[in-house]
Design a protein with these regions (language model features):
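Accessory terminal regions of nucleic-acid processing enzymes
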Residues: 1-300
Length: 300
């Protein structure tokens, strides 16, 4: 018998160890805009050894957690369905998923409250979010259910009397189980799992990603750097103001200013080739045209 554990409880975390879960499968398949397969591998190794999670949350996850209950109530109000909250469903010996709920019509529910849409904007369909599509398919596979609801919720935002007040909104898609999905992705999941097992005893995953420097000397260097950056910003603003004043003196015409050319440049267009290729030739092998850009260091 499968015992359902409350989500995010110690027992729930224990059930998920060394399992390729619904929330991670999109990243494992290289579909996530936020995580790479190597990031998931490191997280899973650390989880296996009981190391502290390196992800402590961000505004997007905080927003989603804060509005989870409202999103659930709005879904039930909109659809008339009841939702039973649930825990982790294992699938086989190395996969599983934790949907946000089981619907009274025999489906599963995945709720999202997109942080990027909190102030308005259009909901993206699931077809444009393949990492979530993979999550939903894994949830149906693990629960043995044949359909799912992918529900996106936007909470009211701002002052109701203001012109820019954002009203509550919801976008719900019914998704059918794709019986061939697991066969298509299983080879890639198998490769990842073999890599995971091979890396379980690699101590690098348990070491900090960054060393910590708290010396007085480093503090002085940061202060100097911040001062330089502030000065650069101020210089850039002053440069724009000077150019604007010269343009005004020239009457918005090309001019010679003490022998130096003041020239109006024309608008130009550019093509986002990477985005165009991804849309026009998805999955194309571009390795022949790849080049290596030498890395460096940046301080943020």
């Amino acid at each position: 018998m499968i015992v359902q554990q409350q989500q995010r409880s110690p027992e729930w975390h224990a059930q998920r160890k060394l399992r390729l879960t619904g929330s991670r499968v999109g990243a494992i398949l290289g579909l996530s805009p936020w995580q790479k397969p190597d990031d998931v591998l490191r997280d899973m190794v650390r989880e296996y050894h009981g190391a502290e999670s390196e992800f402590t949350g961000n505004p997007a996850t905080d927003w989603g957690n804060r509005h989870e209950t409202r999103a659930l109530l709005a879904f039930m109000r909109e659809t008339g369905l009841q939702v039973e909250q649930c825990g982790f469903f294992p699938y086989g010996d190395r996969m599983g998923a934790s949907p946000d709920g089981l619907t009274s019509d025999g489906g599963v529910l995945e709720l999202k409250a997109p942080y990027g849409l909190r102030k308005g904007g259009e909901f993206k369909p699931l077809a444009e979010q393949p990492h979530y599509a993979a999550q939903v398919q894994m949830e149906m596979l693990a629960t043995g259910r044949n359909h799912a609801y992918f529900s996106q919720y936007r909470a009211p935002y701002g002052d109701p009397l203001s012109h820019d007040y954002v009203q509550e909104a919801m976008h719900i898609e019914r998704v059918e189980h794709d019986a061939g999905w697991i066969d298509r992705v299983l080879p890639e999941l198998d490769l990842f799992y073999k890599r995971l097992l091979a890396e379980l005893d690699n101590p690098e995953h348990l070491e900090p990603l960054r060393v910590s420097i708290d010396t007085p000397e480093a503090g002085l260097l940061l202060t100097e750097l911040d001062t330089l950056r502030q000065r650069q910003e101020e210089d850039a603003e002053r440069e724009k103001a000077i150019i604007a004043e010269l343009v005004a003196q020239a009457g918005d015409k090309n001019a010679l200013v003490h022998g130096r050319k003041l020239t109006k440049t024309k608008d130009s267009k550019s093509v986002a080739y990477a985005k165009a290729l991804a849309e026009l030739a998805p999955g194309a092998d571009l390795s022949k045209w790849e080049s290596v850009r030498k890395g460096g260091w940046r301080l943020s």
